[in-house]
């Protein structure tokens, strides 16, 4: 099954996540089909907290990809900010 989920990056104590489209059997930070955005939970100042390619996210959801719980919240937040 294809899922849209977060892949952790960054360094120790400074998380950074990529929104990735991947097979659910792949490792969290492993192989992916496409990166469709990023999420920086500790963004400060002028840094961008969330960036999502809405067109690609809509495409993958239309193809049957299942978002994780957190990604579903982030997609909703991004859609609200874009409107």
From Swiss-Prot:
An annotated GO cellular component: small ribosomal subunit
Keyword Iron carried by entry: no
Residues forming coiled coils: none
SUPFAM superfamilies according to UniProt: Ribosomal protein S16 (SSF54565)
Keywords: Ribonucleoprotein, Ribosomal protein
NCBIfam families (UniProt xref): S16
Protein name listed in UniProt: Small ribosomal subunit protein bS16
